Each structure stands twice: as structure tokens, then as C-alpha cells.
Amino acid sequence: MPQTLTRFRKQFPEVWKAYANLRDTCTDTGPLDEKTVELIKVGISAALGREGGLVAHVSRARKAGASPAETYQAILQGMG
């Protein structure tokens, strides 16, 4: 986790808890499996130029069973 987020989490624990709850609820709601959700987040991170998010979501997508080819395609979708 980037140092800025670590400081934010320590300074505003209730806000961080609410954010984490929203994030988890959004991730768990609906029919998409974990791999698909993480591949979507890979594409979003690539589109926004968020290197930290890209690294984190690529790792999570791979752990959820995404192949390297699927991961690269998700990145390409974010670029296009």
C-alpha cells in the first residue's frame, strides 16, 4: 500500500473502514466471479494510469486464475 494511503488510513480510520466496506460490497455484489472483477479493475487501473492499482489488481487477477494473456488483454482494453 502506498505510504500516502497508509497515513490516510491511520489518520482517518472510520473513513477507511467505510471505504473498505463500500469497496468490498461493490466487489461481492452481482454474478461476476472474482477473476472477472479483478480483470475489470485491471482495465480501469490501466485507463486511469494508476500504477499501484494496476500492480495490485494484476496480482489479484492472477491469484484468481487469470492467465497472462487475459491480464494483458484487460490492460489493452484500458488503453483503448
Q: Predicted regions span which residues?
A:
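An internal, amphipathic alpha-helical element
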Residues: V37-E38, A69
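Conserved alpha-helical segments that form or flank metal/cofactor-binding pockets of metalloenzymes
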Residues: G52
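C-terminal binding/interaction regions
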Residues: Q3, A66-G80
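Short alpha-helical scaffolding segments that buttress acidic/His motifs in well-ordered protein cores
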Residues: Y19, L39-A46, A74-M79
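Acidic, glycine/proline-rich low-complexity segments that act as flexible tails and inter-domain linkers
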Residues: M1-V37, G49, V58-K63
